[in-house]
């Protein structure tokens, strides 16, 4: 692992250690930090709680990470993410944004990319779309509303259909 990737991983693990056990466990298991990623259901079954309760615990932990990391070297990841998002009109798919941050900061690809995803979710200036079928998860600034994104998507589909440059998929 490169020095930058190791530094990020170590800083992230230090921040995780300041969370309560259940928050830390849920986040580690969700992102696959130690083993494979686990679903909300798998984690919920372990604790005897619902998927929704696991999601709530994860959200609380991520918000705490956001507060804690303001004084850590990990802030540069959020700063890079905000800068890149600004250059791309305030909205970008999660995968493209994470890849752009990796390139911008010069992180080796052997870092668990979901660490960057969690750090972006912890950024109070960014919002993450809810996972939906047939769409990519994306990050955006608060002023870029879901309604605006859907309107642009709808208009782009119309233009592409008119040009015959779209492949229809059956639902």
What are these regions (language model features)?
Residues 1-171:
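C-terminal non-catalytic scaffold/interaction domains in large multidomain proteins
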């Amino acid at each position: 692992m490169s020095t930058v990737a190791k530094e990020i991983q170590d800083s992230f693990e230090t921040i995780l250690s300041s969370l309560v056990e259940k928050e830390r466990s849920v986040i580690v298991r969700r992102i696959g930090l130690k083993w494979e990623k686990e679903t909300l259901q798998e984690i919920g079954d372990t604790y005897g709680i619902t998927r929704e309760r696991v999601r709530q615990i994860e959200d609380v932990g991520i918000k705490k990470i956001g507060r804690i990391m303001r004084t850590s070297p990990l802030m540069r990841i959020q700063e890079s993410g905000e800068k890149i998002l600004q250059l791309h009109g305030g909205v970008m798919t999660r995968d493209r944004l994470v890849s752009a941050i990796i390139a911008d900061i010069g992180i080796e690809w052997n870092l668990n990319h979901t660490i960057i995803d969690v750090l972006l979710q912890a950024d109070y200036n960014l919002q993450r779309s809810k996972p939906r079928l047939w769409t990519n998860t994306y990050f955006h600034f608060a002023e870029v509303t879901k309604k605006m994104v859907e309107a642009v998507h709808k208009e782009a589909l119309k233009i592409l259909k008119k040009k015959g440059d779209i492949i229809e998929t059956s639902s």
